[in-house]
Amino acid sequence: MKKFTAKTIKLPKDVDEKYSQMNYLKEISKNIGDIKDGEKDDFVMFGHIEPLYLKNCIKHFESLPENITNFIIKNYDVNKFNLIGQILQSKHPMIFQTFTQVMNGNIISLGCEFALHKKLFEEYYNWHVSVIADLMGGIPADVPVTKEEMTIINDILFTTYWICYGNVNKGSIFVV
């Protein structure tokens, strides 16, 4: 997997029409040059996602309500997530490190937008699918994984990809 670099851009609070989707993509993708109108289809917009960040990385987190972290800590089946942790630890140690941080409440979610060149999106997607397949292959069929739990797993996977294989060049993390 290639190692990428990226930049994080803080949006102004008074975002208005000038941040239409096209301008949005141009703004967050300056590290690969301006996107011409005809190149719009070369990029994938994730829309609104919620990757996870280390709680103490940014002072702004201090003002976030505790219930954001508490949701992650309290609202999951301990045995099920222990099982998921065991699968990750044996097959994907890097992801397991991020997983442990989430389960310990050291990581919280923050909404952001993400634009990625299609080629890199394919790499992320294929990696993500392979990890999910490993997880689902290790969880017994009679242990259902809820939508909320899958959301947490997906956030952990995206975060791990961003930390380990990102900070994704030719696409940028856009903190809002």
Each predicted region: which residue ranges?
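ER/Golgi luminal nucleotide-sugar-dependent glycosyltransferases, focusing on the catalytic module
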Residues: M1-V176
